[in-house]
Amino acid sequence: MATQEEKQKALAAALGQIEKQFGKGSIMKLGDTKTLDVESISTGSLGLDVALGIGGLPMGRIVEIFGPESSGKTTLTLSVIAQAQKAGKTCAFIDAEHALDPIYAAKLGVDVKELFVSQPDNGEQALEICDALVRSGAIDVIIVDSVAALTPKAEIEGDMGDSHMGLQARLMSQALRKLTGQIKNANCLVVFINQIRMKIGVMFGNPETTTGGNALKFYSSVRLDIRRTGSVKDGENIIGNETRVKVVKNKLAAPFRQVDFQILYGEGISKAGELLELGVKHKLVEKSGAWYSYNGEKIGQGKANSMKWLNENIEKSDELEARLRAELVANPEQALMADIEQSENNTESESDFE
């Protein structure tokens, strides 16, 4: 029977052979790797960055964002592109739906002159383009909008009534098998936007499912469920949507956290509104009655006026965001405890009301 010393020598020889054949870093101890702190790209929503646990969407991984129509899926991905471009990243948008509006993208902060766009004719072409971009190693963020629009070539060339059972699911499964390793090696973030369908005949449980089969569910490191929960009004006018995002899968931090924020028409995610709410929750912004104060200075009466002050005072707004990000992203447990405490307070308030 081999002694411990002989086992260690055999292991060292095997590791040496593997590294010689496949390159240095092809095998290592989990604790030795310097890539435990995953690089991330901000989503443009501070609350969502905190809920994700790593400060944003992870580089070198596949992410799925799904939800009903007009829930904010494309807006969220355009916000990710805007944040990536600010960080000096190169981005590409594969527009399988042929519906990307450059004017709207520019309003959300996207530098449309620097954004690579492709409008493929079929699903195979879209995924081949995605594969080529990933393999180039020169693109940092790729958005595919959407999985439902990745129509297989056979379906496009066939007659309208032809049955193509499972064709799209097989296409996605094959593509993701090829892409996953390349995405990790290129340290590229690939975001798939997906739509929701209803499963027929489901009596119990959730009848909703996403298109393109189950492969994307397995290969995704992060899955975000985005929903519209209400309207944002200015008097009688509707100026945006109340939006809720739930992290339904997360391989890099605790899943199942959710966050609420506003998406304003023609503006995108309301940064000032989030800063106020998170600032009050974590005691960086003081609220006394209807008045909000920051660093001992009154900034406005009512939420709307305070948001206006933050939008006008960019330096103060950036300072508050930096303080919140340093406190919450570095200590996600603290953010979680604050959410639990607020939930308990809300429950007590409801009990008192009853």
Swiss-Prot record:
GO cellular component: cytoplasm
Cell location: Cytoplasm
Broad class of the protein's primary localization: cytoplasm
Cross-referenced Pfam families: RecA, RecA_C
GO BP terms: DNA recombination; DNA repair; SOS response
Family annotation (PROSITE patterns): RECA_1, RECA_2, RECA_3
Coiled-coil regions listed: none
SUPFAM superfamilies registered for this protein in UniProt: P-loop containing nucleoside triphosphate hydrolases, RecA protein, C-terminal domain
Keyword Transcription attributed: no
Keyword NAD: no
InterPro entries reported for this sequence: AAA+_ATPase (IPR003593), DNA_recomb/repair_RecA (IPR013765), DNA_recomb/repair_RecA_CS (IPR020584), P-loop_NTPase (IPR027417), RecA-like_C (IPR049261), RecA-like_N (IPR049428), RecA_ATP-bd (IPR020588), RecA_C_sf (IPR023400)
UniProt KW keywords: ATP-binding, Cytoplasm, DNA damage, DNA recombination, DNA repair, DNA-binding, Nucleotide-binding, SOS response
Residues that hold ATP according to the record: 67-74
Gene Ontology terms, MF aspect: ATP binding; ATP hydrolysis activity; ATP-dependent DNA damage sensor activity; damaged DNA binding; single-stranded DNA binding
Family the entry assigns: Belongs to the RecA family.
Function: Can catalyze the hydrolysis of ATP in the presence of single-stranded DNA, the ATP-dependent uptake of single-stranded DNA by duplex DNA, and the ATP-dependent hybridization of homologous single-stranded DNAs. It interacts with LexA causing its activation and leading to its autocatalytic cleavage. Plays a central role in DNA metabolism, participating in general homologous recombination, recombinational (postreplication) DNA repair, and prophage induction.
The protein's name in its UniProt record: Protein RecA
Taxonomic classification: Bacteria, Pseudomonadati, Pseudomonadota, Gammaproteobacteria, Pasteurellales
Gene name of the record: recA
